[in-house]
Amino acid sequence: KGSMALAHNGNLTNAAELREALELNGAIFHTTSDTEVIAYTITNERLRVSSIEEAVSAAMDRIKGAYSLVIMSPQKLIAVRDPHGFRPLCIGRLGDGWVFASESCALDGIGAQFVRDVRPGEIVIADKGGLRSITTHCGQCPRSLCVFEYIYFARPDSVIDGSCVHTA
């Protein structure tokens, strides 16, 4: 039903379990990466539903752990943040287009304007019609940004969920 590219930041806690189930269904893995498990999970769900957005939402019911995703299909760019909000993800505007990044400083680097953070559990779709959100998974879990985000992973010039990393 089409092709997609996937970028992933994070770690799954149930990757081995998902991988085993997917292999029993005929999936052949080429890496040991969580990213490949996520891609197969979305692809597997896509066979059952009518849109990639529905497939991503269904996959979120199965994927557990810390993740932010950016998925590119021929017609859409889709950004996803895990329901806990463990990993940051933000939206930017560059000319007439939309960009997504794990840190706001990446937007600065390309001259994009920060728009907002992706909410925990939110699926954001950018296409010819503009920007829209699916919030089915929002508010399902307590908010839990990874403790290492501010002190180890993020650059000091980033802003995550409204807080400057340097002063947090």
Spans of model-derived segments:
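Conserved short alpha-helical segments that host acidic/polar catalytic motifs at enzyme active sites
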Residues: 1-120, 125-168
